[in-house]
Amino acid sequence: MNAFCSRQHRLFRSLVTVVGLVAVLCLPHPALASTNHHVILITIDGCAAYYLSDTKAPLRTLRKLAREGATAEGMRVSNPAITWPNHTTLVTGVHPEKHSVLFNGVLVRPGPGKPVRVDGQRDKPELVAVPTLYDQLHQAGYRTADINWPCTRRAATLDDSFPDVPDQISHMTPRLRDELIVAGILEGTNDATFRVQSAAVKDQIWTAAATHIIEKRRPNFMLLHMLVCDSTQHKYGPQSPAAYTALALADAQLAEVLRSLDRAGIRDQTTLIVTADHGFETALKIINPNVAFRKAGLLETATAPGILKARAQIVSEGGIAMVYFTDPSTFGEDQTKVLALMREQEGIADILSPHQFTALRMPDPATNRQMASLILVAKAGYAFNNEAQGDMSVTEVTLEIGNQGHHGFLSTHPKMNAPFIAWGRGVKRGARLGLIDNVDVAPTIARLLGQTLAGADGRVLVEVLEKP
């Protein structure tokens, strides 16, 4: 009898355990409530908002998404209007004053009298000062991925990563790298071989990598950054024949992403958001403040390109230039000299001081060592360059030299506005918005995936959602 009771007791305990486990598994899990939903955020680098209404721009796929989905008149970008800061704003919902990405890398100050430099070989934790949307989603159990997205090197919260860094192949997640080599998308593990590819070829590889992940992993949140439009416009200028060709290439890659949704069987569960990091403007005159600084004894160069010593130095962002003073012992004297020089410099529209940085949503140099002491603003038709050698503080651009297209102008410049198109699951078809802000993108994506992004500067774009 005792043995029988013991067996019955063990059986009962086992049954209770199984029933309890089933009950737990059947309970709704708030963190995983929307894991059958997918959002893909795509940036076409340098695709200005004005291209959507430009009849010369061959954007058949993008315009189809706009007709079938929701669009904005334009999207204001963050200062500085360059690639890495704005891609970071898109995934954090905050401006550079908070996320701290001010360049396409980290601004390094080696010490008094030594030139500053921008280092792009940095990991995500060294670059981004706040949590990202993909951090939050990954922690909630969502599958995450990025292809050529800035500031993602060694991001532990991306399940698949092909980061936007100089040595992309070395810093890919190993599983993805191995799969892409087997699939013939990558030729091998040599960074140098990949680095010399044209931007058009790289865009094809990045898109193929994205479609591979979509079909194999079905990520809940994917980031894809395409580059060919930016590199082409820098050389040939915006709204040039070459720029239109680059846009056609980007549009073709966008169509391939759509086809991959069908192959993966997730089109009806997917939302696409297509935007850009900045627009583009033509500038045919280049300002070289470092040349003026060298002539004034504030900077020294060597025979080879580069700066040997600098008490004052600019780092160009394109339409603005960041001014750094490296020696605290001569700061006041050097700043006075630079202000006098730049007030007389051709092509300078304004000189901004730290008390004006808050309005730009840029950090205070007193609390952020990457931030400049002054910002130079270019006049229309001008842009900045880091060149320190030569005799001319202003040079003219020719087609042979290239460098006709620029960004990095203040975000109030209308041509810096990016497009915004939302399409697919959860999007209100036909919704039309005015001018929005890029900080609105991350909280809106969070809502689409059943999450709330705490601490965002932006708002949820409820006007574009079927169920706000």
PLM region descriptions:
Residues S14-P28:
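Bacterial N-terminal signal peptides
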Residues H29-A33:
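Sec/Tat signal peptide C-region and signal peptidase I cleavage site
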Residues V130, L308-R432, I436-T444:
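Active-site neighborhoods of enzymes that stabilize oxyanions during catalysis
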Residues Y50, A200-L224, C229-T270, T336, ...:
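A long, amphipathic alpha-helix that forms part
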Residues H95-G237, G332, R343, N385:
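His/Asp/Glu-rich, glycine-adjacent segments
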Residues L41, T61, L249-F293, I445:
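Metal-dependent active-site segment of extracytoplasmic phospho-/sulfohydrolases and closely related
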Residues Y50-K98, A145:
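Short, structured active-site-proximal loop/turn typified by the sulfatase FGly-forming signature C/S-X-P-X-R
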Residues M1-F12:
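N-terminal secretory signal peptides that target proteins for export/translocation
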